[in-house]
Amino acid sequence: MGSDLVSIIMPSYNCGKYVEETIHSVLAQTYQNWEIIFMDDCSTDDTIKKVSALRDKDNRIHVYQNIANLGAAVSRNNALREARGRWIAFLDSDDLWESTKLEKQIRFMEENEYFFSYTDYQEIDNESKAKGVFISGPEHITKQGMYNFCWPGCLTVMYDASKIGLIQIEDIKKNNDYAMWLKICKKADCYLLDECLARYRRGRAGSVSSHSITTMIRWHYKLWHDAEGKGALSSLWLTGMNLIYGFYKKQKYVKKAEK
């Protein structure tokens, strides 16, 4: 396996409660050639203070701050422009990785000559306790498959920037990770490493998982209409497909551990 640099894109807003735990999950990786591109969106809590203290101990952590509160899409775009690595990975500042995540995913991609991949993950609560919910997805996602639904969890995705290039997305407030996968899937199919290598914090105030279905429908429509430039009817159709495949995903790929 090679030893190319991994750039970890970490946007943040008011995650002071969790950010140290998140970064420690990166520090614990068995694959150590990485950099964190930490992009703070003008947090009003102690996020910057905590991350700066960690940066002072490890120069692989690069801390940036937007000039104003600009949202996750702009934060990811800004962070990606600072990335130097061949491999691009994503980790929000309240989620966690298992210690072998980078090593196993890079090996999976190199051995199979994949340029875009994701892994299984599990849900945790606000106290980092496992909820017993595990999420997987299709083994192979084509461009059309990605149009059907946003299968990958953002915290599990990795792509090869030497093949894909710099990705920049439209300034939409939600579903900006989905907008990114749609752009990447126009250049490379996405493949699943069928192993649980990440932990997603579900239900934090302000997170997507805490919003109503009506709100999420509106976000999906804006994704297709504003970010992908589809007409009104096409945007409605694709939003409907997202709803159908979202139900399908819950039935097929979301599993609850037996108590």
Residue ranges and their predicted role:
Residues 88:
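Short aromatic/hydrophobic "clamp" motif used to bind/position activated sugar donors
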Residues 25, 32, 40-49, 68, ...:
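A conserved acidic beta->alpha catalytic loop
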Residues 81, 137-215, 219-220:
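Conserved nucleotide-sugar donor-binding catalytic segment
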Residues 66-83, 104:
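Glycine-rich, basic loop-to-helix element that forms the pyrophosphate-binding segment
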Residues 4-7, 25, 35, 179:
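Cell-envelope/extracellular polymer assembly enzymes that use nucleotide-activated donors
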Residues 17-20, 45-53, 96, 100:
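Acidic helix N-cap motif at the loop->helix transition within catalytic regions
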Residues 14-28:
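Short, well-formed alpha-helical segments that are part of the catalytic scaffolds
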Residues 100-131:
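Conserved donor NDP-sugar-binding/catalytic core segment of glycosyltransferases
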